[in-house]
Amino acid sequence: IAKELFLSMEMHIKEMNADEHDKHIAYVSHLSHITSFMLGRTVMDKEKNEETIYDLAGSGFESTVRLGKSSPSMWAPIFQQNKKNIIEALDEYIKNIKNFKDLIETDNLLEMSKEMKEINAIKNILKGIK
């Protein structure tokens, strides 16, 4: 009955076991929340003047840190419960951040552009696989 309800609301349903769910959700949900929380932390640590943040932050920053406004009392236990998968996702994310940092440090505009262009494919993935 729940499946019928979700389908009637035009929700996309993907069936998988709990372990698969936890692994995938660490990448597509939990990592997004952690990134948002920590981007907010980084800016708040660096920019001590809240007015400067307000004056300079645009819509891109606002949309990126939107998830950082989520409830810590909800998310801390989720992060703890899915710790193993989240650590794996964070390790992969940190590796990618370091690689991109290296491209910036070495002025490798060609590889930087190539990397960003490849990643632009995510917009089509999020529109839905037909």
Predicted regions and their residues:
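Long, positively charged, glycine-interspersed low-complexity recognition regions
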Residues: 124-130
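Internal alpha-helical scaffold of NAD(P)-dependent oxidoreductase catalytic cores
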Residues: 1-66
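A short hydrophobic/aromatic micro-motif that marks alpha-helical segments and, especially, helix-coil
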Residues: 35, 97-98, 122-124
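Interdomain hinge/lid region at the active-site interface
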Residues: 49-119
